Amino acid sequence: GKPYALLSRRAVQQKCMEEYLPTLSPGVILDARVTHLEPFGCFVDIGCGISSLIPIDAISVSRISHPKDRFKVSQDIKAVVRSVDENGRITLSHKELLGTWEENAALFENGQTVAGIIRSVEEYGVFVELTPNLAGLAEPRDDVYVGQQASVFIKSLIPDLIPEKMKVKLIILDAFDAQYSPERPRYFIENGILSHWRYSPDSAAKLIETVF
């Protein structure tokens, strides 16, 4: 019969890992594919069969109740290496690629009516996500709930008035239930290596940053 080569999938995967893992260090931006979603985070395949976790608090600045609010299985995304432990286990982050406060705020203007998603309902107000890395606060309401789509009026973008504060004041015009499928995020950074990332403006009283 004809000669054939018997390849061990495990051996190929092991060789791939041996060559790939040394290239992964904190700050490296890479491609990933979502494999499954858990309440605590999102598992992704980063190549060579390597599974890595993006913790829920590292997915975006705007808080979500479950990773399914941001991702879906088989979705291709970008991620950045946050840490690699002594066993080669890799933890990733995602929010650093979604733009700073100023970059996201620049997409909007005072007086605009835009779409958002209600992410949190508190006694002092309702947080509405405008982008994954930007949320605004509306007056308290007891007739809305987390997960609803909302039409909001941008009352003020605080940097126009007080650069030290990162606030967007909103008025909820309408809130309604709607099925939506997570879309590919808008990435402000898609490749390279990050040494640090600062979300807050230079003049902000509160420093929000990631050091890799």
List each language-model region with its residue ranges.
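Short, charged/polar, Gly/Pro-enriched secondary-structure boundary elements
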Residues: 12-18, 97-103, 175-182
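Secondary-structure junction/capping motif
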Residues: 6-11, 66, 93-96, 100-103, ...
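Surface-exposed interaction/gating patches
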Residues: 26-50, 62, 78, 85, ...
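A generic tandem-repeat structural signature
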Residues: 1-38, 43-44
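A generic local secondary-structure boundary/capping motif
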Residues: 21, 31-33, 67-69, 80-81
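Short, acidic/hydrophobic/Gly-rich beta-strand patch recurrent on exposed beta strands
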Residues: 6-10, 43-47, 57, 91-95, ...
